[in-house]
C-alpha cells in the first residue's frame, strides 16, 4: 500500500507542477502581448566585435514577438512599447515613457531607418523586410546625380523687387533682372528635386530644411537671410554713385548742362552727360576704317618730331678777353702734407690777354676747364713774383692761386713737348714785362713807354720753330729784346 500511495502522491505532485508551469507560461505570454520588454540604450560608440546571428532563434522568437528581438544592452533609460496585433510586424509604435533621463529620442527595433548590412543584431530576414518597407515608403530609387543636397532659394516678392528695380535703375536694369529671375528659377527647380531627398533622409532634416513653398516666403522678416535684406535695402535706397558730380566739384569754372527731363535717363547717363570728348570719338571712327597696313604706313610716313631747344648765350666772362694760346693738357696740384701730386683734371688750358688801365699795357690770366663738364679747374692771373720752371720736355711747373682756398700752390702742367714749349715762352715773355714795369714803378731810370711796355700780341698766325723758341727762352733775361719782337706764339 505504501508503494501505491507513493506513486499516487508523486503523480499528483508532478501534475500540479506541470499545471503551475503552464499557468506561468500562459501568464508570461499574456504579459508579452500586453507589455513589451524594456529596451536599454547607451550613447557609447558601437563595438567592433561581431557575434554570429542564429536564424533558429529568430524563427522561435518571431511568433512570440511581432517585430521585436531580444537584446542585452547597457541602459540609461527605459521605454515601454505597445504594439498593435493587427499590424503584423509593421513598425508603428506608440511609446509610453516609464522612467525618463537626459535622452529623449529612443530608437525602436527593428529600426525604421536604413541599417548597415554588417549589423550583428539584424538577420537576413529582418534586413530584407526593412529594405522592402523602405522601398514602399520611398518609392522608386533616386539617381546618384539627384542625391545632392542643395539649399533652397528664398525668393522675395517679385512685384516689389521689379518696381524698385524699374524706378531706380531705369529700363536697362529690367533686362538684367529678368535674366537673374531665370537663373533663380532654375536653381529653385534643382532645390525642389533635392527636397524629395530630404524627406527620405532624416539626417538632412536636422541640418538643412529644403522647401520651396510660397508660405515660407511669406514668413516673418526675422527668418529671411541677411543677404536678401541687404539687396532689398540697396535697391530701395535713392543714392546713386556719381550723381550730381558737377555740384560737388570745387572750382571757379563749372560745366553747364541742360536740365534733365527724365530721372531714370539721368541716373543711367551720369558720367557721360558731364564729360564729352568729341575728338576721341572721331579718332576712333577713323581708326576703325583704316586697316593695319595703312595705319603702319601713315605712322612711318610721319616726320619724327624733334625737340628743338632754344639757343642760350653762355656768359663765361671771357668775352672781352683775347685768347693767345689754347692747349689740351692735364693739371696736377702738389700736396705739402703728403708730398705727392694729385690730379685736378683734364681739359683745355687758355692764356688770355686784356688791355690794362695804362695805355699799352696788358693783363694776362690762365683759365682751365674740365673736359665734358666744363667745370672750372684753374683761374689765376699772372703777376711779377710768379715762378715758372720747365721740369722736362712735357712737364711745366708754375705757381698759381688755387680756387679752393685762394692760396698759392704749385701746379704741374702735363702736355705735349711742342705745346709745353709754346706755353713756357708765352708765360715767360709776360712775366719779364711785368717785372720790368715793377722796377720802373719803384724809381728806376725812366725809359720810353714803348720800350718798357709789353706790346699787344698780334692774333695772326706765325710760324716759328722750337729751336727759335729755345733761343728766346735762353736769352730771355734781356727785356729790351722782347719789346722789339712780335708775337712768337701761335694763337
Curated annotation (Swiss-Prot):
PROSITE patterns: RANBD1. Keywords: Cytoplasm, Nucleus. It is found in: Nucleus; Cytoplasm. GO terms for cellular component: cytoplasm; nucleus. Residues 440-468 are annotated as: Disordered. Its main location: nucleus. Residues 447-459 have a biased composition (Polar residues). Residues 270-441 form the RanBD1 domain. GO terms for biological process: intracellular transport; mesenchymal cell differentiation involved in bone development; negative regulation of osteoblast differentiation; positive regulation of myoblast differentiation. It holds the Pfam family Ran_BP1. Nuclear export factor for BMP-specific SMAD1/5/8 that plays a critical role in terminating BMP signaling and regulating mesenchymal stem cell differentiation by blocking osteoblast differentiation to promote myogenic differention. Directly recognizes dephosphorylated SMAD1/5/8 and mediates their nuclear export in a Ran-dependent manner. Interacts with SMAD1, SMAD5 and SMAD8. This is Ran-binding protein 3-like. It comes from Mus musculus (Mouse). The lineage of its organism: Eukaryota, Metazoa, Chordata, Craniata, Vertebrata. The gene is Ranbp3l.
Amino acid at each position: 500500500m505504501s508503494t501505491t500511495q507513493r506513486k499516487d502522491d508523486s503523480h499528483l505532485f508532478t501534475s500540479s507542477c506541470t499545471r503551475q508551469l503552464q499557468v506561468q507560461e500562459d501568464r508570461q505570454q499574456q504579459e508579452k502581448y500586453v507589455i513589451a520588454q524594456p529596451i536599454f540604450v547607451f550613447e557609447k560608440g558601437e563595438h567592433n566585435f561581431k557575434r554570429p546571428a542564429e536564424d533558429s532563434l529568430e524563427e522561435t522568437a518571431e511568433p512570440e514577438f511581432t517585430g521585436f528581438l531580444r537584446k542585452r544592452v547597457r541602459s540609461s533609460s527605459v521605454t515601454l512599447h505597445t504594439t498593435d496585433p493587427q499590424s503584423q510586424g509593421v513598425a508603428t509604435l506608440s511609446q509610453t515613457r516609464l522612467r525618463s533621463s537626459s535622452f529623449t529620442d529612443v530608437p525602436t527595433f527593428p529600426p525604421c531607418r536604413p541599417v548597415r548590412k554588417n549589423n550583428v543584431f539584424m538577420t537576413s530576414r529582418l534586413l530584407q523586410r526593412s529594405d522592402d518597407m523602405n522601398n514602399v515608403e520611398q518609392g522608386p530609387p533616386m539617381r546618384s546625380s539627384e542625391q545632392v543636397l542643395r539649399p533652397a532659394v528664398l525668393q522675395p516678392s517679385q512685384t516689389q523687387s521689379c518696381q524698385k528695380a524699374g524706378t531706380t535703375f531705369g529700363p536697362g536694369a529690367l533686362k538684367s533682372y529678368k535674366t537673374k529671375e531665370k537663373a533663380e528659377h532654375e536653381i529653385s527647380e534643382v532645390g525642389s528635386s533635392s527636397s524629395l531627398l530630404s524627406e527620405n533622409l532624416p539626417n538632412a532634416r536636422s541640418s538643412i530644411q529644403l522647401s520651396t513653398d510660397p508660405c515660407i516666403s511669406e514668413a516673418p522678416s526675422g527668418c529671411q537671410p541677411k543677404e536678401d535684406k541687404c539687396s532689398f535695402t540697396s535697391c530701395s535706397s535713392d543714392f546713386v554713385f556719381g550723381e550730381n558730380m558737377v555740384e560737388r566739384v570745387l572750382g571757379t569754372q563749372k560745366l553747364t548742362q541742360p536740365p534733365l527731363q527724365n530721372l531714370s535717363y539721368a541716373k543711367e547717363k551720369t558720367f557721360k552727360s558731364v564729360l564729352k570728348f568729341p575728338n576721341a570719338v572721331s579718332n576712333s571712327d577713323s581708326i576703325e576704317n583704316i586697316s593695319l597696313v595703312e595705319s603702319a604706313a601713315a605712322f612711318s610716313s610721319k616726320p619724327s618730331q624733334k625737340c628743338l631747344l632754344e639757343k642760350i648765350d653762355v656768359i663765361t666772362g671771357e668775352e672781352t678777353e683775347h685768347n693767345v694760346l689754347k692747349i689740351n693738357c692735364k693739371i696736377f696740384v702738389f700736396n705739402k702734407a703728403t708730398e705727392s701730386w694729385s690730379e685736378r683734371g683734364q681739359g683745355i688750358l687758355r692764356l688770355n690777354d686784356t688791355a690794362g688801365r695804362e695805355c699799352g699795357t696788358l693783363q694776362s690770366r690762365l683759365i682751365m676747364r674740365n673736359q665734358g663738364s666744363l667745370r672750372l679747374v684753374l683761374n689765376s692771373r699772372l703777376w711779377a713774383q710768379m715762378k715758372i720752371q720747365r721740369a722736362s720736355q712735357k712737364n711745366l711747373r708754375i705757381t698759381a692761386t688755387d680756387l679752393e682756398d685762394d692760396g698759392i700752390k704749385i701746379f704741374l702742367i702735363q702736355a705735349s713737348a711742342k705745346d709745353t714749349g709754346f706755353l713756357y715762352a708765352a708765360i715767360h715773355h709776360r712775366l719779364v714785362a711785368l717785372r720790368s714795369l715793377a722796377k720802373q714803378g719803384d724809381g728806376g731810370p725812366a725809359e720810353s713807354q714803348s720800350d718798357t711796355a709789353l706790346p699787344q700780341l698780334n692774333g695772326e698766325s706765325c710760324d716759328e720753330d722750337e729751336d727759335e723758341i729755345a733761343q728766346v727762352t735762353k736769352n730771355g733775361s734781356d727785356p729790351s729784346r722782347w719789346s722789339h719782337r712780335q708775337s712768337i706764339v701761335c694763337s
